[in-house]
Structure formats: structure tokens, C-alpha cells
Amino acid sequence: MRITIQEYVVNEIDSGPYGITVGKDGALWFTEQKGNRIGRINATGEINSFPIPTANAGAMSIISDQTGDLWFTEYNSSKIGKMSMNGLFEEYVLPTTNAAPFGITEGPDGAIWFTEMNNGRIGRITKSGEITEFELPNSKSFPSFITLGSDGALWFTQNQNNRIGRITTKGEVKEYPIPTPNSGPVGIASGPDGAIWFVQIIGNKIGRITFEGEIKEFVIPTPNARPHAIIPGKNRDLWFTEWGGNQISRITVEGVITEYTIPTNNAEPHGITFCPDGDLWFAEECNQIGRLTIIT
């Protein structure tokens, strides 16, 4: 498979792009974790930014819901943010202080689900702003990314508890220990094979877990690659960012890994998403947005 990578510099210096998603308008929307803005980039590379009302909010992960609204986590301010396509913001304060919300996804019930890193909880917010929090067995588990599984449950990584968690829309929780000790799971996604896939930022592996809890692990070729985010691909594969390896990588459902080097050194890639046209876009904390095009 041949690819090309283009990179677009964000207008504002030291904006710190982190999360990224495809909007209903076809553009890419991303969080500027350091710049305290939500950014938008179109297919030609034109970038606009929208300041977040709360100062130093620490915007991290971002999604676009079925109606087109953008939802994002505010790690520093313990809020969930909502933004319309025309730049109107609403912010919802979490009941728990210093919750550090991080991962976010839309649930099968139409609500938005998110993780609370600092207090070991999974949160749920309705489109009208009503918030419910579910406590995990270990309050120090550091839940990170979260995704919707094809079984209708929400699956999440527990970075400091070395487990993959599963929570139903009723709040019922199950946990599955990862074979590699202290693996540091972070990104998680529902794969094209129906299983749940996740990255191990310390274990340097990609993991796969079935709904029965059976886990397989695949070693990343580059040492200390520090994989971060992962998403399903278009050809029975998944793609993930290597924060330490400075690469965008592909893993097939059979576990074969291919790595592609980012042109900019120390780009610090984090969030990653696919556009409908098949291009893959990713956020680089070095103040750029990357675009990977598959040639063959």
C-alpha cells in the first residue's frame, strides 16, 4: 500500500491540536488543547478557529453527533462542551469537581458518554444537558478513551488499572484484565471484525478483545512507539497514531502492522479520523493537521 502525507499549519502559534473528528458538513473539526479553541479545516486546508468560552478549558477529545452538533471534553474545567456548526457554544459543568473528562462517544441511547479520569467514573449526558455518573470498582483506574461496541455497550480503557471496561446503558460494569502487565491502555475502537481493539502506550502493543473477554496482543515493530488513538479503517483494518514513533500505522484484523513515517519530526500525533472520501486526518500537537491519502 502506497500513501502520501500532507501537513497543514494551524494559524495560531502553539495551539496544540489534540482530538479530531469529521463534521456533518464534511469538514474536519479539532480541539486546540493549548490554544483553547475548536478548529475547523476543510479539504483545501483552509482553517478557522472558534474560542471556547471557558479559559484554559483543556479541550481534549471531540465527536460529531448524529444531529451535527460537536461535543468535546474539557479536561481542566471539568465540563462537557457542545458547539453548533455555526460556532455557538454551550458548556455543562460536571457534578464532580476535578473530574478531568477525557474520552467521549455517542451511545446507542442517543446520549453522549464520556470518561472521568481523576475519579474513576463513566459519565452520561443527554442532549438537553442532564448528567449521570457511574462509579467504577477502582476509583484510581484512570478511564481514558471510550467507544461504542457493536454489542450496544460502551467499552473503555483503564489506563492505570490495566483493564478494558464495558458498561451497559443501565450502568452495569464488567472489567477484563490485560495480559501484559502495566500496559497503559489508551485509545480504543470497535473494529471491522466486530471485536474491540485498543492500544497499549506502555506495552507497545495493539490489543484485541472479543465480547467474551478473550484478548490477543500484537507487538508494534517500532520500540517505544507510544501508540495513542485508534480507529477502524476501510479494508478490514484499523489505523493508529504513534506518538513516540512519529508514525501513522495500519493493522489488519489478522494482526499485520505497517508503519508510515510523518514528514515532520516530533509531530506528536494524537487524534485520528477518516473522511468519507477515504483520506485519513490526524492532529499533530506540533501545531499541524495531517492528512494521509491512500494511493494503492
UniProtKB/Swiss-Prot annotation:
Its cofactor is Mg(2+). It is an enzyme of class 4 (lyase). The keyword Transcription regulation does not apply. Its EC number is 4.2.99.-. InterPro entries: Streptogrm_lyase, Vgb, WD40/YVTN_repeat-like_dom_sf. Substrate binds at H228. It comes from the Bacteria. Gene3D superfamilies: YVTN repeat-like/Quinoprotein amine dehydrogenase. The active site is at H270. Mg(2+) binds at E268, E285. Keywords: Antibiotic resistance, Lyase, Magnesium, Metal-binding. The keyword Magnesium applies. Belongs to the Vgb family. Inactivates the type B streptogramin antibiotics by linearizing the lactone ring at the ester linkage, generating a free phenylglycine carboxylate and converting the threonyl moiety into 2-amino-butenoic acid. Monomer. This is Virginiamycin B lyase.
